[in-house]
């Protein structure tokens, strides 16, 4: 159940977006109704014809309400039931078909996966990314599974049109590591160190530090000014 989200300019001095990640067709409509400012429709598991049909419908609805919309072509790999699936490389022509619908951002599989990358990961397919960029023009491309991708690959991906990079697992790992150190140091046993606000504070600060580091790497600092 998703409740109504009310936004206030007093929350933060920078521009904010409440974005749905990997939304289903039904989930997108729920989040639109709830007040999200941006949605992602992940139709990559549908045949391309159905992905196009559903994306086209959601583009019209989102833009009528002033929302941005991200779409996906080519499944992003990841771990499920202990098995790591390697990411697919999207068909550049299918990417163009989705981009031509007027989406604001396009997530395309280029060998990237969610979560930790296995030792035998072959890396990003820059050949695929280059082909997609040439066919989609100025379309902002999205790279999911940003955790663990080497810096040189990140920078090359940005040079080839990637404008949004998702990083989640690395933030979670930073949080877990900082929280673990707090407890192992016995700080939860000092005074009211067991208070969740104190117990979780180091983890929250660790996430902030990780995000700051990524913003600097991605060239995102100062873009909201």
Regions found by a protein language model. Give the residues of each.
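Charge-dense, low-complexity intrinsically disordered segments
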Residues: 3, 45, 119, 201, ...
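C-terminal alpha-helical cap/extension of soluble enzyme domains
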Residues: 150-225
């Amino acid at each position: 159940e998703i409740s109504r989200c009310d936004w206030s300019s007093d929350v933060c001095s920078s521009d904010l977006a409440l974005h749905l990640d990997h939304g289903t067709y039904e989930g997108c409509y729920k989040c639109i109704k709830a007040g999200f400012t941006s949605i992602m429709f992940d139709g990559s598991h549908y045949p391309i014809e159905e992905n196009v049909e559903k994306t086209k419908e959601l583009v019209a609805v989102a833009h009528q309400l002033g929302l941005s919309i991200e779409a996906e072509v080519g499944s992003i790999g990841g771990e499920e039931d202990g098995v790591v699936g390697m990411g697919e490389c999207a068909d550049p022509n299918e990417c163009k078909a989705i981009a031509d619908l007027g989406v604001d951002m396009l997530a395309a599989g280029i060998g990237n996966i969610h979560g930790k990358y296995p030792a035998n990961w072959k890396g990003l397919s820059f050949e695929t990314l280059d082909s997609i960029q040439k066919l989609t023009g100025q379309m902002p491309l999205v790279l999911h599974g940003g955790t663990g991708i080497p810096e040189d690959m990140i920078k090359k991906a940005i040079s080839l049109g990637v404008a949004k990079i998702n990083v989640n697992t690395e933030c979670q790992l930073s949080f877990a590591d900082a929280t673990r150190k707090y407890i192992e140091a016995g700080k939860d046993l000092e005074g009211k160190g067991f208070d969740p606000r104190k117990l979780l504070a180091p983890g929250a600060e660790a996430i902030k530090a990780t995000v700051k580091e990524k913003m600097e790497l991605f060239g995102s600092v100062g873009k909201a000014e």
